[in-house]
């Protein structure tokens, strides 16, 4: 008797954007794909509606799902996948893929009408894409004690929050002074985040295969303070002038805030475990940029080449 090889992803979890009525229909279409390939399906009880299907898989807690799955399918926008990526950081080697029910979709790149691409991924036909994560730490200046920590796949932002005044920052990279400047804040971004807040702040687009970090000042008072790209193994430390310490917050992917206090500083470096995304065959980052940023459209009022 022929034995079927084990599926590339034996246990698959599905997490959806809460409150989206279209998710139930997508789940109904995904379940037969998983069943046909011998995959165990787990639904996130926090976000997934009841399907009413006799083949209804287990609805489990978010923690159970994150610990058990080899692949997690995120149904929603980029924010949904970012939330999941932050949650799995450092847990285990779990892959993430996204079905786009949001707007832009830089990370969730499978359209609901193209679920055949999900089938290809489940069959092992996929592009693996490892993305750098940032580890943000609030540390004591006195003895370097870790006070608070979080992770980010897009960016860590030190920003003013309860004042209209600029804040004063001192930045060091690997212990070497970089700048003392006044601004509305500082964006510390991954290559993934280079097409998010950092791009809006005038930073460059950095290919996600590069092991790098971006420093992008937010409205700096001195125009010579420009965006900077540094090696991904760098340790970035930021001190806030004591006069402004109560007026700043540290935001991780705009999903969680850390508070600085007198005598503490922000330390940002690469997380030891990257996020593993999987894309359908033929995935191209440059095609994604063309589609999402409108680079592929015709030039206005210019005859096409060869016309």
Curated annotation (Swiss-Prot):
It catalyses: NAD(+) + ATP = ADP + NADP(+) + H(+). NAD(+) binds at residues 78-79, 83, 154-155, 165, 182, 184, 255. PANTHER family: NAD KINASE. The keyword NADP applies. The active site is at 78 (proton acceptor). It comes from Halorhodospira halophila (strain DSM 244 / SL1). GO terms for cellular component: cytoplasm. It is found in: Cytoplasm. GO terms for biological process: NAD metabolic process; NADP biosynthetic process. This is NAD kinase. The gene is nadK.
